Amino acid sequence: MARENTNKHYWLRKLKKGTASVAVALSVLGAGLVVNTNEVSAAVTRGTINDPQRAKEALDKYELENHDLKTKNEGLKTENEGLKTENEGLKTENEGLKTEKKEHEAENDKLKQQRDTLSTQKETLEREVQNTQYNNETLKIKNGDLTKELNKTRQELANKQQESKENEKALNELLEKTVKDKIAKEQENKETIGTLKKILDETVKDKIAKEQENKETIGTLKKILDETVKDKLAKEQKSKQNIGALKQELAKKDEANKISDASRKGLRRDLDASREAKKQLEAEHQKLEEQNKISEASRKGLRRDLDASREAKKQLEAEQQKLEEQNKISEASRKGLRRDLDASREAKKQVEKALEEANSKLAALEKLNKELEESKKLTEKEKAELQAKLEAEAKALKEQLAKQAEELAKLRAGKASDSQTPDTKPGNKAVPGKGQAPQAGTKPNQNKAPMKETKRQLPSTGETANPFFTAAALTVMATAGVAAVVKRKEEN
């Protein structure tokens, strides 16, 4: 702004100075027209002496043209100032539009980044949805397999439970039967053992009684034998006659002793047999006890089998409960996956909605960018129209200058033709703008002073005139000013 104000004041100073305006006119139109300005002015002044009416008309015409040019110049200045102000406004608006465009471009880039991010998130969510669907299908397949396996396990468990019940029932029946048999056999063995013990005790008692009797008999026999021996010894002398009888009796006694020995041996054999029978009974009793232990061990094994079957039943029930819990967990997982799938679908819908909003915002921004571009093109178009208008006005001014140059050339030609006629009297001064006719009888040598005076007066007001501010000079200055404005606009 400071530079433009400086340039404006600079050109105003140049327009105020006649020499500078003539220099500008020389640079624009050429040196020929401006160099001859004084000569034209002088020619016009000399022409007025020869033909005052034509000079008056020419001066009036130049005054009107000068007035029109001044008016046009003022209008052009005003319009130039307005155009400058409008140009400044357009520049400010253009800067604002550029700033707004940059902001919109930044927002557009941000929205593009958001769109790319949303697209990436959308692709990620689509992949997650696909993975979730794949996992859901896999879980459905696994759930179907687990359901089939669960049904199969339930069927097997039911079969095992039925089989376990049947086995348990059979084992219970077998155990009860075995226990009853063992108890019956044990009772029978106990009764047999009791009977055998009674028989053994009775046999032992009988054997002991018989042995005691045999001992008593042997003692008695020994006593008898001793008494007999004593008697025999005492009566040996006395009973020598009865030796044969005694020998016979001794033989009988020996035979009785042998019989007693045989009886004693038989008793020993019976005792040994009873002891053997007792050992056999004890062995049989031990065998029965071992069988009882075996039956007890079998009963314990059956009890263990029963406990194992019950434990297996409990394990099967626990497995069934575990499978039911796994089924519940899988059902809950399936429901969770369904919820996750619904949530992912909802998120996908939201992402698509956000993407649509972003696309709509992006479209609005693109539309706004297009409008900005169009407005920019429109301002450039208005600027071009303004420049074309200024160039057209400058061209019109140049055409007017050309016309004035032609008229000046005609005036010069008229001056050349008038120089052949007699001069007017020098005593009568021609005052331009008042319509005074020159007096007759003037001498040719008296026309230098009026020429100097008319050079210093304006045609209409009679004021002292600057030769540089003639109509041609003003036209040249106006044209130069317009050309300078156009040039500055082009540079801007």
Swiss-Prot record:
A motif (LPXTG sorting signal) lies at residues 458-462. Residues 462-492 form a propeptide. One of its GO terms (cellular component) is extracellular region. Keywords: Cell wall, Coiled coil, Peptidoglycan-anchor, Phagocytosis, Repeat, Secreted, Signal, Virulence. C repeats lie at residues 251-285, 286-320, 321-355. GO terms for biological process: phagocytosis. Residues 71-115, 249-354 have a biased composition (Basic and acidic residues). It is a peptidoglycan-anchor. Its main location: secreted. It is found in: Secreted, Cell wall. The modification Pentaglycyl murein peptidoglycan amidated threonine is found at residue 461. The keyword Signal applies. D repeats lie at residues 388-393, 394-399, 402-407, 409-414. Residues 69-103 are annotated as: 5 X 7 AA tandem repeats of L-K-T-K-N-E-G. The keyword Zinc-finger does not apply. Residues 1-42 form the signal peptide. Sequence repeats lie at residues 69-75, 76-82, 83-89, 90-96, 97-103. InterPro entries: LPXTG_anchor, M_anchor, M_repeat, SMCR, SMDRR, YSIRK_signal_dom. Belongs to the M protein family. This protein is one of the different antigenic serotypes of protein M. Protein M is closely associated with virulence of the bacterium and can render the organism resistant to phagocytosis. This is M protein, serotype 5. It comes from Streptococcus pyogenes serotype M5.
